[in-house]
């Protein structure tokens, strides 16, 4: 027997036995037992039926059982199984009819392939054994055979089979449905992509098409205008009609889009015109955007609109935003419409009856105004349509369309507009027919307010009926053509008691049956809000009368008030909106409003920006609620303050007016406002005149749907909101236009308001209205009233009454922040005292004490900084201050100041030891402003500023003709010549022969002073010994022209100082007596930060005028232990020439001080040595007996220095001049009984000894003017040897006074130069020396990381082709330094800062990192931080040879192509007014031109390390404005990488070099740079600590620390850890930063204290740091898992990344790979070591390893080195490689053709377990061009450099991944992906 199943061509049957078994075991049929196709089965019986005694098959039909051949046409089944064997049976399993009929071909595991789906089914035949196993109950028992006992009944087994098959069928159906959905979504995505491409193409073509269209339109328009007469201008009515038609069409289109999904579907009127065709569907785009917004995890903003208001709710999800907005809208509309609609229904009939009785005419309302719409809502149409909850006002001509509920408006979520919700609703029918109307209305405040409002509306429309109509039949109104009618009072019935109570002039008794109502229209203003009990009657004057009193205003403004509601001070402005009459019973206290309206659940935080008149008797208007919330940032907790305590100091004087506030949500006592950004602005208060006393007037002309319309088309009702946002599906957005999804607005809010049609302004509305009337109805008072009405409307600002009034109005507040112009404004009534207070506070903050100058002098830049402002007393009263300002000419604005004395600077007595400073004279200096001060530029290039005065302040002698040159004169080379021993001997011999008196006379004659003065000077060193005071002047007066008087700032900003710049403890190295013991250290007198700041000021040289050495020994008086200190200039190899001075003393003499005057002049290059070796201090002792390890003395050294400009002229004070004269004879001063020695003589006598090298060790030496002699070179050394001398205790005459107060020797001036100091400009030729001039524009609100400008040095210099570039072009290569000079606007308050970064090797790639330049990347590159406070001129000098590694070629780059990036570091703390600009120059400084490549190595191995450079920035770091600021700590991980973005990280070359070392000890040097606003100040304390040690401010004072009193400056701290060292790769050390003063900021300034930290270097103590290994051998890569036996590989000998498709490559990361990747190029020699291991037992194994080195490829290949090794044996091979190309250097980038290549081959490679490639660096290996490492992402992810997946192998370390050779890897990988090996042969 066989069975055949048909299903409309799709056959459902089991193809084989195995399929049947799977169907039984896998449950591959559905729950109801259907095969997936739901087929119709037909059966054909091919064998006679069995005997009747056989058991019937379950599920068979009667026809089958009877043996009928006819098919079962109506039987639907899923499975038909034919079982062969005795007896043959078939199983028919019927399915349910009409369920899931699928027409598609069958799919799934049981589906038949399409090629096998034929018209005949496949027979499934089972043997008897199989049938017995599968379904034993189907077999009929045979004769003579015992039937097997069935474990279950047939029905039970059939049910089990059915259940198992149903589960699999259901799974198949689900897979089919899932496939349909996938196809559908794919089609949607494809359509979306096509639409996006079309939109992009349309956007690209739009400008061109628009230009063509505009041009064609202009041509046609000009031709038509020339040919035709000008058409008449359209009337206002026509314009209004056109606007109305456009608005109606838009409304119809919007409503039509959602009609199919409306919950309420009333019957449509088929007589309506057909709607416009639907726009193309863009459902997929909108659905995707909506789903993306719904799935956002952060809080989102949702907006909705109400009449003239907008709202923005912030909720965790979009669903919460929609629900909150719809709930508020529904409540608002219900509350408003309840009173208004009910009141309108009452007043409609009453007013019309009154019209008929009084005027005899019927009143027609103007369609489109508020009254007609409200009354239309309350008409019969509302009653007829209440069943469908639709409120509509029928138009006159067109029938009314159905209106969708609010849920459909919610579906149009992205397009909510103002006009969508400006309709009225009546939610339910309410009975208003009550017995006691007055009592009920009093109880219902909302109904009372609505009646009051509509009453005013109707009364005004009475007058409007006579006077104001739409322009239909314009008739000019005759002036005063009618008179007032006699019927001015009309009787009314008793039912209108409420109107009589409030609208009639006199109060009548309560029970009077009738009263009169005045016929003339009168409007009642806001009532007094203080009335509480019962409404009072206010007698209002007529329109022609003047108001004698002021009425309190009524305020309406957005205020969503919750418990944690915040107010934004920054955007508050006052806007008075027209408001209805506020009844007394509608006023309530602020804190008790709307408690019952608090929404359920947690309340979100809001931020509010709106006017807030906060006064003591502030009231809230319960009547009309308008909701609007502006989008605002998150309010921080420290920016909040209580509501009632806001602006307490800004309350006006006098009684406070009553206000009425309109708000929809509750107020509570915990109401908070935003303290941080609040700024109150109040409109000018003026008296309200009678013409303006009509708050209801603007409502009469305000349209309801944001446009004026003659006939209202519809007034849709707002029904219930959607239950959930999940109801919104894809079909909701099918009919929306494409333009709805593409716009150029910054946010959705702007896009919403851009679609709102603008309302007609008052002027436009008045222009469209004309006056019309008749002789009977027009009254004289009406004409007067209308004139005043037009005047009243035209006087308003038009933006106040448009649909965007809240956003477009520009409020003009009275209160403004003060703007200080830098001078006193005599017209200011308050004297502008705040300006002086402000400037004095700034001066105090920046340490700028005030100074006044004489107007008759000419001042330089230094004097300009010392200008003092006149301080006007603050306790003189307002009148006195105003009088002094207004009477400026009569003011006594003089200051008594002590100018320079006109005598000798110092007069001292030989016997009394009293120094007489001389008499002082007080001079009257008139008050001047800064504009009167002038600066003397001097000669071109002069950077020295000498003060010109009327008379010399210091008595100076006539020019001396003899040979003299004292420190302080303008001769730069006076002390440059070396001291010769012969000249010194002659000078000493003359000194010994002459008497002391002769020496004094000679000294006096030489310097032009008296004998007494010379004797006092000569004896000055001995007189200073008992007091132990320094003879040096105060450091603040050393370089000033004043020797006495006020304290002033020093020249050139940097204050010279002789404070103890460095103090060391002298610890003996030998404990035994008689052995010499010494101790030495190096000292740099000027820091890197000081030099950088002085370079910006144009200085280039340092003059070391005085060196002060102090020895404070450890011991008792009388101790004869000798101590000797010698100071050398260690940059001179000859000690005789390098000696600055030496001093010897005894421990028993106590404190010893010596001041030397070396006159040493150094360029900044001399001070920028890598190890800081400028001065060397040697301390020794010959007879010390102190225990070993304890300090013998404390030695301090300090300098008195001055920075010089190119002119080398300088000015010193008289005190310093006298000090130099005191030490002239012996060239040093002594104290404490010390013996000092210094090079003698101020002038070198004799003949310079010229020396010409002749070779062979012979020199030609000049012996006289014309005499020369030939001799061998000889050298001599100057040795200071100490010896013990008996110095008893008799010389000790008492206690030693060790005070240092007043000396100025070790005083720190305590202030840095102000950041806004002006800088003296150079000569006019300076601009011509620039190689490039550029300009940069910065946006006023630029954010951190914004890339402002990029300077390609070679390209841009080539483009401008200036004089310098032409010189560069002639020579070829540029070497040396470049200086970038920026002219920036000086501003210390904005807090704006920038970074200038040099990228020489293209490490920044916009395709990888985006358009913004990461600040972290700039912090690792060579970078200078620039703040606007550093202006106006900022310079940055960098060495091209060191940073680029080679000289720059003039036309294009070689290995380096340097670019300078200008980027924003920190945002503006104080907002800028407009965009700004600055210019810069690129200058060549200390440069040379040559034709040499001139490579300068960054590091050469091996290297002698005296210091370890770090060279990176960290920050920006902020300190909060609080009384207890938390300390900031930097983790000092010098060797680890920095994460730049995402999983991309990098490190610079200095950090890569530190990877070679484990760690070190020493001293950490760095500096702090302030980048924030000057309004925030702070003093910092820095200290190093171990990570496990807790450090507080108290404990930091007790350990090594550094205090930056000004919040910035250089620092140096010793590394202090338990092991006296720190690790470069472990988190071990912290730099803790404490705020010890501040942060302090004035009011309204919320900017935190911001700074950057630069880590410069570590000064080593023990020399070479601890390396990571003894032999610098590194494993470059490893090969494993070879896929073929004959394995070959080749790569260029340049240490690249290696990729191979025939094996697995494991790249290693180590210091060598990082250093190669972080530098530009390298050169040197190395040995490649190949090592391999086997994965099998060595026996008869064959195979070999061969490696060779060849130069070039292919035919031109040159064989060099080759080696062959068997696989079994040493398992190692070595090949020496030289990393060079034709340039002498190489990179890890793309290979070339002619360069060394390494060829490696393995036979029987599968036997090799691993092949390792090691590299051993040889001596002389050099790296060039320090930069940062290439960017790569993690292994297995898309590479940021390659654009494809990285090779598997190089592991990440902590935060770093990737390896060297990114460019080579890119080229190699691209070639291998294309199917070829670029380095293979053939």
Swiss-Prot record:
Residues 1289-1320, 1838-1863 are annotated as: Disordered. InterPro entries: Nepo_coat, Nepo_coat_C, Nepo_coat_N, Viral_coat. The lineage of its organism: Viruses, Riboviria, Orthornavirae, Pisuviricota, Pisoniviricetes. It comes from Tomato ringspot virus (isolate raspberry). Belongs to the nepoviruses RNA2 polyprotein family. GO terms for molecular function: structural molecule activity. Keywords: Capsid protein, Host cell junction, Repeat, Transport, Viral movement protein, Virion. Residues 554-698 are annotated as: 2.5 X tandem repeats, Pro-rich. GO terms for cellular component: host cell plasmodesma; viral capsid. SUPFAM superfamilies: Positive stranded ssRNA viruses (SSF88633). GO terms for biological process: transport of virus in host, cell to cell. Residues 1289-1303, 1838-1847 have a biased composition (Polar residues). This is RNA2 polyprotein.
């Amino acid at each position: 027997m066989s069975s055949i199943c048909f299903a409309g061509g799709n056959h459902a049957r089991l193809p084989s036995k195995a399929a049947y078994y799977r169907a039984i075991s896998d449950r591959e049929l559905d729950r109801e037992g259907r095969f997936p196709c739901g087929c119709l089965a037909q059966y054909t019986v091919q064998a006679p039926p069995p005997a009747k005694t056989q058991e019937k098959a379950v599920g068979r039909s009667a026809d089958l059982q009877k043996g009928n051949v006819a098919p079962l046409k109506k039987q639907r089944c899923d499975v038909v199984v034919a079982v062969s064997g005795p007896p043959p049976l078939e199983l028919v399993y019927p399915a349910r009819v009409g369920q899931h009929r699928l027409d598609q071909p069958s799919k799934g595991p049981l589906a038949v392939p399409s090629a096998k789906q034929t018209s005949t089914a496949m027979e499934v035949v089972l043997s008897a054994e199989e049938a017995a196993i599968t379904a034993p109950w189907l077999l009929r028992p045979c004769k003579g055979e015992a039937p097997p006992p069935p474990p279950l009944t047939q029905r039970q087994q059939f049910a089990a089979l059915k259940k198992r098959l149903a589960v699999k069928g259901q799974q198949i159906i689900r897979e089919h449905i899932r496939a349909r959905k996938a196809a559908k979504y794919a089609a949607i995505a494809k359509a979306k992509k096509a639409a996006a491409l079309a939109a992009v193409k349309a956007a690209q073509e739009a400008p061109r098409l628009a230009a063509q269209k505009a041009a064609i339109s202009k041509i046609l328009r000009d031709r038509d205008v020339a040919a035709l007469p000008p058409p008449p201008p359209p009337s206002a009515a026509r314009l209004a009609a056109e606007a109305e038609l456009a608005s109606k069409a838009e409304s119809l289109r919007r409503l039509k889009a959602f009609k199919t999904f409306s919950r309420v579907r009333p019957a449509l009127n088929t007589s309506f015109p057909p709607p416009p065709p639907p726009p193309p569907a863009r459902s997929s785009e909108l659905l995707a955007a909506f789903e993306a917004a719904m799935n956002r995890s952060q809080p989102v903003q949702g907006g909705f609109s109400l009449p003239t208001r907008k709202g923005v709710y912030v909720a965790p999800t979009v669903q919460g935003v929609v629900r909150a907005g719809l709930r508020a809208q529904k409540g608002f509309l219900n509350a408003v419409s309840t009173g208004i609609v009910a009141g309108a229904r009452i007043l409609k009939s009453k007013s019309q009856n009154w019209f008929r009785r009084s005027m005899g005419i019927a009143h027609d309302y103007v369609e489109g105004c508020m009254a007609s719409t409200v009354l239309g809502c309350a008409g019969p149409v509302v009653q007829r349509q209440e069943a469908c909850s639709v409120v509509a006002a029928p138009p006159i001509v067109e029938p009314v369309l159905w209106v969708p509920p609010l849920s459909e408006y919610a579906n149009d979520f992205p397009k909510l507009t103002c006009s969508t919700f400006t309709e009225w609703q009546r939610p339910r029918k309410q009975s208003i027919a009550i017995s006691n109307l007055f009592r009920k209305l009093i109880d219902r405040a909302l109904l009372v307010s609505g009646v009051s409002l509509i009453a005013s509306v109707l009364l005004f429309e009475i007058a409007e009926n006579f006077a104001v109509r739409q322009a239909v039949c314009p008739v000019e109104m005759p002036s005063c053509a009618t008179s007032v009618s006699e019927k001015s009072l009309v009787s009314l019935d008793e039912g209108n008691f409420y109107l009589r109570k409030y609208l009639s002039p006199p109060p009548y008794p309560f029970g009077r049956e009738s009263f009169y109502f005045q016929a003339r229209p009168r409007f009642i203003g806001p009532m007094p809000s203080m009335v509480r009990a019962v409404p009072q009657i206010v007698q209002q004057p007529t329109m022609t009368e003047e108001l004698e009193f002021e009425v309190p205003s009524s305020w309406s403004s957005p205020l969503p008030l919750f418990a944690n509601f915040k107010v934004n001070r920054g955007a508050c402005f006052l806007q008075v909106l027209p408001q209805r009459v506020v009844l007394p019973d509608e006023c309530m206290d602020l804190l008790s409003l709307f408690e019952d309206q608090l929404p359920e659940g947690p309340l979100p935080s809001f931020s509010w920006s709106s006017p807030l008149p906060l006064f003591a008797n502030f009231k809230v208007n319960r009547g009309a609620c308008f909701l609007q919330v502006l989008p605002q940032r998150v309010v921080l907790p420290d920016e909040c303050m209580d509501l009632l305590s806001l602006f307490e100091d800004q309350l006006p004087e006098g009684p406070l007016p009553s206000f009425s506030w309109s708000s929809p949500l509750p107020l509570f006592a915990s109401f908070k406002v935003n303290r941080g950004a609040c700024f109150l602005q109040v409109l000018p208060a003026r008296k309200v005149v009678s013409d303006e006393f009509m708050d209801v007037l603007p409502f009469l002309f305000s349209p309801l749907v944001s446009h004026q319309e003659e006939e209202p088309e519809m007034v849709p009702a707002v029904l219930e909101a959607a239950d959930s946002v999940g109801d919104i599906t894809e079909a909701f957005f099918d009919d929306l236009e494409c333009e709805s999804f593409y716009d150029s607005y910054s946010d959705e809010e702007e896009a919403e308001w851009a679609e709102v049609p603008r309302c007609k302004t008052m002027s436009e509305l008045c222009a469209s209205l004309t006056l019309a009337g008749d002789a009977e109805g027009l009254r004289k008072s009406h004409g007067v009233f209308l004139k005043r009405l037009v005047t009243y409307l035209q006087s308003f600002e038009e933006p106040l009454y448009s649909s965007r009034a809240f956003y477009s109005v520009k409020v003009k507040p009275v209160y403004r922040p003060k703007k200080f112009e830098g001078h006193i404004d005599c017209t200011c009534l308050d004297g502008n005292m705040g300006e002086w207070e402000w400037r004095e506070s700034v001066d105090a903050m920046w340490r700028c004490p005030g100074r006044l100058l004489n107007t008759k002098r000419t001042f330089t830049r230094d004097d300009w900084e010392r200008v003092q402002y006149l301080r006007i007393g603050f306790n003189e009263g307002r009148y006195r201050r105003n009088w002094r300002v207004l009477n400026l000419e009569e003011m006594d604005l003089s200051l008594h100041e002590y100018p320079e004395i006109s005598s000798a600077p110092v007069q001292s007595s030989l016997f009394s030891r009293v120094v007489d400073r001389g008499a002082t004279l007080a001079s009257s200096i008139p008050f001047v402003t800064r504009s009167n001060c002038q600066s003397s530029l001097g000669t071109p290039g002069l950077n020295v500023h000498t003060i010109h005065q009327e008379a010399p302040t210091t008595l100076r002698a006539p020019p001396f003709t003899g040979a003299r040159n004292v420190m302080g004169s303008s001769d730069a080379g006076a002390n440059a010549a070396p001291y010769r021993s012969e000249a010194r001997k002659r000078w000493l011999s003359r000194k010994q022969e002459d008497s002391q008196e002769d020496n004094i006379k000679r000294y006096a004659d030489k310097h032009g002073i008296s004998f007494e003065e010379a004797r006092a000077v000569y004896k000055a060193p001995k007189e200073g010994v008992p007091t132990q005071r320094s003879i040096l002047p105060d450091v603040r007066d050393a370089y000033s022209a004043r020797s006495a008087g006020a304290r002033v700032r020093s020249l050139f900003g940097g204050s010279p100082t002789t404070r103890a710049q460095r103090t060391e403890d002298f610890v003996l190295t030998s404990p035994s007596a008689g052995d010499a013991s010494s101790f030495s250290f190096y000292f740099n007198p000027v820091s890197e930060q000081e030099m950088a700041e002085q370079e910006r000021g144009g200085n280039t040289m340092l003059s070391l005028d005085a060196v002060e050495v102090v020895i404070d020994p450890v011991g008792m008086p009388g101790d004869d232990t000798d101590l000797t200190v010698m100071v050398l200039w260690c940059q001179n190899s000859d000690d005789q020439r390098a000696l600055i001075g030496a001093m010897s003393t005894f421990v028993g003499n106590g404190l010893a001080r010596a001041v030397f005057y070396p006159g040493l002049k150094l360029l900044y290059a001399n001070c920028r040595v890598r190890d800081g070796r400028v001065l060397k201090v040697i301390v020794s002792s010959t007879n010390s007996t102190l225990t070993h390890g304890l300090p013998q003395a404390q030695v301090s050294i300090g300098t008195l220095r001055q920075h010089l400009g190119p002119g080398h002229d300088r000015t010193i004070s008289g005190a310093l001049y006298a000090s130099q004269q005191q030490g002239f004879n012996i060239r040093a001063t002594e104290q404490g009984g010390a013996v000092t020695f210094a090079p003698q003589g101020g002038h070198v006598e004799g003949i310079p000894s010229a020396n010409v090298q002749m070779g062979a060790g012979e020199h030609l030496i000049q012996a006289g003017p014309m005499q020369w002699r030939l001799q061998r070179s000889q050298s001599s050394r100057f040795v200071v040897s100490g010896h013990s001398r008996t110095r008893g205790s008799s010389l000790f005459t008492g206690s030693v006074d060790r005070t240092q107060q007043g000396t100025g020797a070790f005083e720190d001036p305590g202030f840095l130069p102000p950041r806004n100091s002006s800088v003296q400009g150079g000569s006019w030729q300076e601009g011509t020396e620039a190689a490039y001039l550029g300009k940069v524009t910065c946006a006023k609100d630029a954010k951190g990381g914004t890339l402002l400008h990029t300077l390609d040095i070679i390209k841009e210099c080539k483009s401008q082709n200036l004089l310098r570039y032409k010189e560069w072009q002639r020579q070829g290569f540029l070497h040396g330094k470049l200086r970038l000079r920026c002219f920036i606007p000086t501003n210390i308050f904005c807090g704006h800062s920038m970074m200038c970064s040099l990228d020489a090797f293209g490490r920044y790639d916009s395709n990888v990192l985006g358009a913004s330049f990461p600040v972290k990347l700039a912090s690792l590159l060579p970078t200078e931080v620039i703040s606007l406070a550093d202006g106006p001129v900022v310079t940055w000098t960098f060495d091209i040879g060191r940073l680029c590694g080679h000289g720059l070629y003039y036309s294009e780059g070689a290995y380096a192509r340097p670019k300078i990036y200008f980027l924003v570091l920190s945002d503006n703390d104080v907002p800028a007014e407009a965009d700004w600009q600055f210019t810069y120059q690129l200058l060549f400084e200390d440069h040379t031109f040559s034709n040499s490549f001139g490579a300068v190595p960054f590091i050469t191995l091996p290297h002698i390390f005296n210091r370890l450079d770090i060279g990176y920035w960290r920050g920006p770091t902020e300190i909060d404005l609080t009384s207890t600021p938390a300390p900031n700590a930097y983790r000092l991980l010098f060797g680890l990488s920095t994460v730049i973005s995402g999983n991309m990280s990098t490190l610079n070359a200095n950090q890569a070099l530190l990877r070679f070392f484990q760690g070190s000890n020493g001293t950490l040097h760095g500096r702090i740079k302030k980048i924030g606003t000057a309004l925030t100040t702070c003093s910092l304390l820095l200290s190093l600590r171990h990570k496990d040690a807790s450090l507080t401010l108290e404990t930091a004072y007790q350990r090594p620390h550094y205090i930056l009193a000004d919040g910035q400056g250089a620092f140096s701290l010793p590394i202090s850890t338990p092991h006296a060292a720190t690790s470069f790769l472990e988190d071990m050390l912290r730099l803790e930063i404490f705020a010890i003063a501040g942060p302090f900021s004035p009011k309204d300034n919320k900017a935190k204290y911001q700074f950057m930290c630069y880590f410069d270097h570590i000064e080593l103590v023990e020399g070479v740091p601890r390396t990571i290994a003894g032999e610098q051998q590194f494993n470059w890569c490893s090969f494993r898992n070879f896929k073929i036996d004959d394995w070959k590989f080749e790569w260029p000998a340049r240490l690249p990344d290696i990729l191979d498709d025939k094996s697995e490559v494991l790249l290693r990361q180590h210091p060598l790979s990082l250093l190669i990747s972080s530098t530009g190029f390298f050169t040197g020699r190395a040995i490649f070591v190949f090592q391999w291991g086997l994965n099998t037992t060595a026996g008869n194994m064959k195979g070999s390893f061969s490696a060779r080195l060849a130069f070039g490829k292919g035919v031109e290949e040159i064989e060099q080195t080759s080696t062959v090794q068997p696989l079994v044996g040493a398992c190692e091979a070595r090949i020496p490689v030289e990393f060079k190309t034709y340039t002498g250097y190489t990179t890890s980038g793309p290979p070339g053709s002619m360069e060394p290549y390494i060829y490696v081959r393995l036979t029987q490679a599968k036997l090799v377990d691993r092949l390792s490639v090691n590299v051993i660096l040889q001596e002389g290996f050099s790296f060039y061009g320090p930069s940062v490492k290439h960017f790569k992402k993690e292994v297995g992810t898309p590479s940021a450099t390659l654009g494809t997946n990285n090779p598997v192998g190089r592991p990440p370390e902590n935060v770093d991944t990737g390896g060297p050779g990114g460019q080579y890897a890119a080229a190699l990988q691209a070639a291998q992906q294309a199917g070829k090996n670029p380095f293979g042969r053939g």
